[in-house]
UniProtKB/Swiss-Prot annotation:
Belongs to the prokaryotic/mitochondrial release factor family. The keyword Protein biosynthesis applies. Methylated by PrmC. Methylation increases the termination efficiency of RF2. It comes from Cutibacterium acnes (strain DSM 16379 / KPA171202) (Propionibacterium acnes). The gene is prfB. This is Peptide chain release factor 2. The keyword Cytoplasm applies.
Length: 368
């Protein structure tokens, strides 16, 4: 890149970062950090462990956000200095270093710009994700497991902690369903664009005649419920069933009735959990998921009443992405038209570009 072009690119990045700072308001966040630090300093903070966890998690997230902004600002200033050296002394080494750093800065600032689009009521929350096999028999169950691995690898790439709450294995291969929590700030806002029906087209490895098979799996994304949401569920509204936890092929993984299934009688919503060690832990985990589902149900009802529910591409069951492995290889988002030919990379968790495109698409539809 020529020096003059590089200088303009850096000026544009500088302006983009300033716009991001205006949206994120770092000074307000620093004031909130100071308040949270005062709360953390209180000796009896951990007497209320749930509140303490909320305070410390929020503090860590804000500190990381401020550090990220300050680091980007410092790096842009460093590039300005390198460009001054390159212009004054025809320093090719400084120009090369500035070029490399500018490419990295563009990627990071673009990603941060997408983050500023996450301003929904629950976007800052952690996420509860459920994957279910749909039409397509054993291929659908196998596809559901492929999607589970994809999201686990995506979380791993970002350093996010994942807690698997429940896995229901199919008899021949794959899974009937799986539910997990992504413990990361803005996990809900980020992953909510993945909600919908995903379609796989391939030569079925389970078909002796090697025929092409189309199968489907559904992804549901909910925000983790917090204490301030006041989602109270009377015991009288619950039916609690206990059963043996099972593994692949229907194998029992323990000899006690530790797995728990909760049925919310007023709505008919059913949630199960079998991955914790005890019945008490499984019931608590299942209750968290049930609360998240009830919170989402209330939110959808409220939006419907306000006649503002935008269901295209976001609703459970709306087809949103196709994964074609035969006769060619292509993953395509049906809402944004973003597509990638490297299907192996996608199934290995390289889906940030799809998520970013989905977030931009959602914001555009919200503002149109």
């Amino acid at each position: 890149m020529a020096l003059v072009d590089l200088q303009q690119t850096v000026e544009d990045l500088d302006a983009s970062l300033s716009s991001i700072e205006n949206v994120l308001d770092p000074e307000a966040k620093k004031a909130e950090i100071a308040d949270l630090e005062r709360q953390v300093a209180v000796p009896n903070l951990w007497d209320d462990q749930e509140n303490a966890q909320r305070v410390t998690s929020r503090l860590s997230a804000l500190q990381a956000e401020i550090e990220r902004l300050e680091r980007l600002r410092a790096r842009i200033e460093d590039v300005h200095v390198l460009l001054e050296f390159a212009a004054a002394d025809d320093d090719k080494e400084s120009l090369a270093e500035a070029t490399t750093e500018t490419v990295k800065l563009r990627e990071e600032i673009d990603a941060l710009e997408v983050r500023t689009l996450l301003s929904g009521q629950y976007d800052e929350r952690e996420a509860v994700v459920t994957i279910r096999s749909e039409a397509g028999g054993v291929d659908a169950a196998d596809f559901a497991e492929m999607l589970l691995r994809m999201y686990l690898r995506w979380s791993e790439r970002h350093g996010y902690k994942v807690e698997i709450l429940d896995t229901s294995y199919a008899e021949e291969a794959g899974i009937k369903s799986a539910t997990f929590v992504v413990h990361a700030p803005f996990a809900y806002g980020t992953l909510s664009v993945e909600q919908g029906t995903h379609r796989l087209v391939r030569i079925s490895p389970f078909d002796n005649q090697g025929r092409r098979q189309t199968s489907f799996a559904g992804v549901e994304v909910l925000p983790v419920v917090e204490e301030t949401d006041h989602v109270d569920i009377p015991e009288s509204d619950l039916r609690v069933d206990v059963f043996h936890a099972s593994g692949p092929g229907g194998q029992g993984v323990n000899t006690t009735d530790s797995a728990v299934r909760l049925t919310h009688l007023p709505t008919g919503i059913v949630v199960s959990c079998q991955n914790e060690r005890s019945q008490i832990q499984n019931k608590a985990a299942a209750l968290r998921v049930l609360q998240a589902k009830l919170l989402e149900k209330a939110r959808e009802e409220q939006e419907a009443e306000m006649n503002s529910l935008k269901s295209e591409g976001n609703s459970w069951g709306a087809q949103m992405r196709s994964y074609v492995l035969h006769p060619y290889q292509m993953v395509k988002d049906l809402r944004t038209n973003h597509e990638v030919g490297n299907t192996d990379a996608v199934f290995d968790g390289d889906i940030d570009d799809f998520i970013d495109a989905g977030i931009r698409w959602r914001r555009k539809n919200e503002t149109d």
